[in-house]
């Protein structure tokens, strides 16, 4: 990948997604784009980028962007945040709202572990919540909606008793149970877009997201 192509990738990421792509990630970007190029029918990353610059195609552009986003996440990441959510915030809000469901937004939910962790915390607190979990990546959302995780993914952050209580094993996957699924709605959203009147929540989780966003758009 040439420095010029990387500069254009930086502009693409910033203009469409608001994310910054720093120069030290150039080799990583080229490595990640290899499978995308092959999937899209190109022999090389350079050939794919040349085609993209010549005729910008929305689907190809988003495929490139999604591949360069950081999907890193796991269950109950930063455990203290979820303990505070379940043991302090939810009870206080529930009392203030007279038992009405608490509306929660998981912004930048990636592959869903944060949203399911919030649902588990609410279930264990015995408090009704409605969780909207959004992300820019369609591929990440597909996995999130499936609620299916590998043994490694499910054990990364969850104790065995929690895993067995809230997930069913199906061959090599662990799948979120119906009680959790009823609480979470996944949708695609760009955090850089202006919010609508429907975006009204009692609690917003937006964690490990803004560090990758252009400072001017945070």
Predicted regions and their residues:
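Conserved AdoMet
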Residues: 1-105
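Short strand->helix junction
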Residues: 19, 74-75, 111, 194, ...
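Residues at alpha-helix caps and immediate loop-helix transition turns in enzyme cores, especially N-
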Residues: 25, 81, 114-117, 197, ...
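Conserved hydrophobic residues forming the short capping helix/wall of the S-adenosyl-L-methionine
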Residues: 37, 93-94, 122, 148-149, ...
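Short, well-ordered alpha-helices that flank and scaffold nucleotide-derived cofactor binding pockets
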Residues: 87, 91, 120-124, 146
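Extended basic-aromatic, gly/pro-enriched interface segments that bind polyanionic ligands
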Residues: 107, 129-205, 209-217
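Conserved SAM-binding loop of SAM-dependent methyltransferases across substrates and taxa
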Residues: 111-127
């Amino acid at each position: 990948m040439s420095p010029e192509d990387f500069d254009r990738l930086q502009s693409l990421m910033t203009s469409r997604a608001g994310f910054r792509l720093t120069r030290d990630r150039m080799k990583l970007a080229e490595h990640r784009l290899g499978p995308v190029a092959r999937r899209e029918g190109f022999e090389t990353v350079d050939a794919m980028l040349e085609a993209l610059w010549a005729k910008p195609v929305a689907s190809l552009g988003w495929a490139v962007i999604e591949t360069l986003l950081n999907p890193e996440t796991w269950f109950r990441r930063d455990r203290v945040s979820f303990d505070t959510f379940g043991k302090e915030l939810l009870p206080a809000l529930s009392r203030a709202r007279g038992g009405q469901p608490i509306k929660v937004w998981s912004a930048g939910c990636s592959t869903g572990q944060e949203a399911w962790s919030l649902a588990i915390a609410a279930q264990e607190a015995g408090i009704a919540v409605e969780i909207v979990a959004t992300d820019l990546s369609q591929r990440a959302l597909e996995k999130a909606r499936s609620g299916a995780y590998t043994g490694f993914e499910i054990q990364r952050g969850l104790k065995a008793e929690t895993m067995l209580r809230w997930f069913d094993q199906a061959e090599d996957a662990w799948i979120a149970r119906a009680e959790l699924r009823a609480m979470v709605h996944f949708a695609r959203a760009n955090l850089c877009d202006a919010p609508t009147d429907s975006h009204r929540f009692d609690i917003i989780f937006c964690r490990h997201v803004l560090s990758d966003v252009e400072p001017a758009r945070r």
